[in-house]
From Swiss-Prot:
Belongs to the RRF family. One of its GO terms (biological process) is translational termination. This is Ribosome-recycling factor. One of its GO terms (molecular function) is ribosomal large subunit binding. It is found in: Cytoplasm. Pfam families: RRF. Responsible for the release of ribosomes from messenger RNA at the termination of protein biosynthesis. May increase the efficiency of translation by recycling ribosomes from one round of translation to another. It comes from the Bacteria.
C-alpha cells in the first residue's frame, strides 16, 4: 500500500470515530444528536436531517421544522423511540426538544459509550496497519522490495498507526471532558 492510501484510510477511520462521538449527548443542545435517528417516511427509512430543518435555538433547545408537515408525527415518534432520553414537544408546525442536563449516572454511561467508539476506531486503524504490513511482507517474499525496504516501510506504517491512535485518544479525552462538564 502506498503511504497516501494508508494515511487516507486511517484519516477516514478517525473521522468516522469523530462522527460517532458527535452523536453522544453532552448536556448541551446540538443538532448532530439527531444524526443517527431515521424516520419511516413513505415506506423508507429516512434521516431526520433529510426531512426537516434542524436548528439549535439555545444551549438547551433544538428546533425541528419539517419540510412536509405530514411527517411531523413520524419524526416525533422516531425521536421518542430513540435511546437519547429526550422528549419532543410538538406544537403542530415545529418540534422542540428540550435537552435536560445529564445525571451523573448518564454521564458515566456516555463516557463508556465514547470509550467503546474510540476502541472501535483503534481496531479499524490496527486492521489497516495489519493489511499494509501483510502487503509489505508479501512484496518482500515476491522479491519486489528488499528486506530493508520492507522493514523501513513497516516502521513507517507503525508510526502512522501510533499517530492516528493518539489522535483518537486525544479526541476521546476531549469528549469525556465535554460529557463530564456540568
Amino acid at each position: 500500500m502506498k503511504e497516501q492510501e494508508i494515511q487516507s484510510s486511517m484519516n477516514k477511520s478517525v473521522e468516522a470515530t469523530q462522527r460517532n462521538f458527535n452523536t453522544i449527548r453532552t448536556g448541551r443542545a446540538n443538532a448532530s444528536l439527531l444524526d443517527r435517528i431515521s424516520v419511516e417516511y413513505y415506506g423508507a427509512e429516512t434521516p431526520i436531517k433529510s426531512l426537516a430543518s434542524i436548528a439549535t435555538v439555545d444551549s438547551q433547545t433544538i428546533s425541528i421544522q419539517p419540510f412536509d408537515i405530514s411527517c411531523l408525527q413520524a419524526i416525533e415518534k422516531a425521536i421518542s423511540m430513540s435511546d437519547l432520553g429526550i422528549t419532543p414537544n410538538n406544537d403542530g408546525k415545529v418540534i422542540r426538544i428540550n435537552v435536560p442536563p445529564l445525571t451523573e449516572e448518564r454521564r458515566k454511561e456516555f463516557c463508556k459509550l465514547a470509550s467503546k467508539y474510540a476502541e472501535e476506531g483503534k481496531v479499524a486503524l490496527r486492521n489497516i496497519r495489519r493489511d499494509a504490513v501483510d502487503k509489505e511482507k508479501k512484496d518482500e517474499k515476491e522479491g519486489l522490495i528488499s528486506i530493508d525496504e520492507s522493514r523501513d516501510n513497516q516502521l513507517e506504517i507503525q508510526k502512522f498507526t501510533d499517530k492516528y491512535i493518539s489522535l483518537i485518544e486525544t479526541k476521546l479525552s476531549e469528549k469525556e471532558k465535554e460529557i463530564l462538564k456540568v
